[in-house]
C-alpha cells in the first residue's frame, strides 16, 4: 500500500505541474472545441446559462449476459425470476460551476453519471431495475496543449468521485475516490488514464479494489466515421479486472449505432466481484470523439 501511495502522490501533483507550464497552454476557451476534450467543451460559452455538457458517453442498448448474479440480489423477492436479457443505459452530464477559476483554461465543474440495468422484458415481475449506479463528481479541470513524443495532453482533471447503488443492506454498494484524469490524443488516437485513491468507508464492499484496481484506462480510435473504443480496470496484484469494447457509427446527425461487449468483473457495483460477459446493441448520442 505504501508503494501505491508513493506512486499516486506524483500523479495527483501532475495537474498543478502541467498548469504551471504556461508557455505550452493556449487560450482555448473561445476556440472551437478540441475533439475528445471534455474540459475544452465545458469551456465553450453558450447564451443559455443552463446548458449541460456530455461527460461520459450517453447510450441505450439491449443486452444479453452469459450469467446473472442472482446470489447478490437474493433478498429481492423476484431474484429467482430475474432474466439474463436487460436494457442497459447510461446518462452522463457535466456542468461548469466556475470557468476561469485558475486561469482562462481552467474550470471548476460537476458531473453526474447514472448507469442502469433494466429487466424490461421481465413483465411478470413488473419490469424492475435490477441495478442502478449513481456517480456524482466534483472536479477541477484544465485544457492544455502540452506536447510530448507526438502526443498532445488535452485534459488534466482532478476531483472527488462518489459511486453508489443507492440501496440499503444487504445489497448496498458504494465507494468514494480521489482521482486524476489525464487525456491525450495523437491523430486518430485518444488515450485516457484515470488513477484513483479510495477514501472513506467501504464496509459494504471492503474488497472492491481487489476486483476494480486503482485505475481505469480508456483508448479510442477514429476510423472514418466509426469510433472504436476500449476501456478497463485491472489489479495487477490479484489478476482481477474487467474490460469493455465498443463500436459506434453515425446513423443520423445526432444518433449513432452502438455495439458494446463487457467481459470480466465490475460491470456494476452489485457485480463488482462477479465475472460475466455481456453483449449489447443499441443507440448512442455521443462517443469519445
Curated annotation (Swiss-Prot):
Gene Ontology molecular function terms on file: calcium ion binding; lysophospholipase activity; phospholipase A1 activity; phospholipase A2 activity; phospholipase activity; protein homodimerization activity
GO BP term (any one): lipid catabolic process
Keywords: Calcium, Cell outer membrane, Hydrolase, Lipid degradation, Lipid metabolism, Membrane, Metal-binding, Signal, Transmembrane, Transmembrane beta strand
Cofactor: Ca(2+)
Predominant subcellular localization, coarse grouping: membrane
Reactions it catalyzes: a 1,2-diacyl-sn-glycero-3-phosphocholine + H2O = a 2-acyl-sn-glycero-3-phosphocholine + a fatty acid + H(+); a 1,2-diacyl-sn-glycero-3-phosphocholine + H2O = a 1-acyl-sn-glycero-3-phosphocholine + a fatty acid + H(+)
Residues holding Ca(2+) 2: 167, 172
Gene3D superfamilies (UniProt xref): Phospholipase A1
Pfam families: PLA1 (PF02253)
Cellular component, GO annotation: cell outer membrane
Localization of this protein: Cell outer membrane
Bilayer topology term: Multi-pass membrane protein
Cofactor note text: Binds 1 Ca(2+) ion per monomer. In the dimeric form the Ca(2+) is bound by different amino acids with binding of each Ca(2+) shared with ligands coming from each monomer (Arg-167 and Ser-172 from 1 monomer, Ser-126 of the other). The Ca(2+) ion may have a role in catalysis.
Residue positions binding Ca(2+) 3: 204
Binding site residues for Ca(2+) 1: 126
Record keyword Hydrolase present: yes
SUPFAM superfamilies the UniProt entry points to: Outer membrane phospholipase A (OMPLA)
Active site location: 162 (proton acceptor), 164 (nucleophile)
Enzyme class, UniProt record, top EC level: hydrolase
Signal peptide from the UniProt entry: 1-20
Complex formation: Homodimer; dimerization is reversible, and the dimeric form is the active one.
Protein family membership: Belongs to the phospholipase A1 family.
Biological function: Has broad substrate specificity including hydrolysis of phosphatidylcholine with phospholipase A2 (EC 3.1.1.4) and phospholipase A1 (EC 3.1.1.32) activities. Strong expression leads to outer membrane breakdown and cell death; is dormant in normal growing cells. Required for efficient secretion of bacteriocins.
Name this polypeptide is given: Phospholipase A1
Amino acid at each position: 500500500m505504501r508503494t501505491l501511495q508513493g506512486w499516486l502522490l506524483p500523479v495527483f501533483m501532475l495537474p498543478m505541474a502541467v498548469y504551471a507550464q504556461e508557455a505550452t497552454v493556449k487560450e482555448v476557451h473561445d476556440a472551437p472545441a478540441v475533439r475528445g476534450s471534455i474540459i475544452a467543451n465545458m469551456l465553450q460559452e453558450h447564451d443559455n446559462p443552463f446548458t449541460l455538457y456530455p461527460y461520459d458517453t450517453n447510450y441505450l442498448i439491449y443486452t444479453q449476459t452469459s450469467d446473472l448474479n442472482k446470489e447478490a440480489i437474493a433478498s429481492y423477492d423476484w431474484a429467482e425470476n430475474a432474466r439474463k436479457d436487460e436494457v442497459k443505459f447510461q446518462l452522463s452530464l457535466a456542468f461548469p460551476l466556475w470557468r476561469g477559476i485558475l486561469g482562462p483554461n481552467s474550470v471548476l465543474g460537476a458531473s453526474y453519471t447514472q448507469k442502469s440495468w433494466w429487466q424490461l422484458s421481465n413483465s411478470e415481475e413488473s419490469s424492475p431495475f435490477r441495478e442502478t449506479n449513481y456517480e456524482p463528481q466534483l472536479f477541477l479541470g484544465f485544457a492544455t496543449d502540452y506536447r510530448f513524443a507526438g502526443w498532445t495532453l488535452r485534459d488534466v482533471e482532478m476531483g472527488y468521485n462518489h459511486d453508489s447503488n443507492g440501496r440499503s443492506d444487504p445489497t448496498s454498494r458504494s465507494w468514494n475516490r480521489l482521482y486524476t484524469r489525464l487525456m491525450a490524443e495523437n491523430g486518430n488516437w485518444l488515450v485516457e488514464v484515470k488513477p484513483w485513491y479510495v477514501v472513506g468507508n467501504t464496509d459494504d464492499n471492503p474488497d472492491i479494489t481487489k476486483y476494480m484496481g486503482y485505475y481505469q484506462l480508456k483508448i479510442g480510435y477514429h476510423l472514418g466515421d466509426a469510433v472504436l473504443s476500449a476501456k478497463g480496470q485491472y489489479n495487477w496484484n490479484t489478476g482481477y479486472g474487467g474490460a469493455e469494447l465498443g463500436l459506434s457509427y453515425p446513423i443520423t446527425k445526432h444518433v449513432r449505432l452502438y455495439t458494446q461487449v463487457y467481459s470480466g468483473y465490475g460491470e456494476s457495483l452489485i457485480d463488482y466481484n462477479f465475472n460475466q460477459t455481456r453483449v449489447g446493441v443499441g443507440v448512442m448520442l455521443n462517443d469519445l470523439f
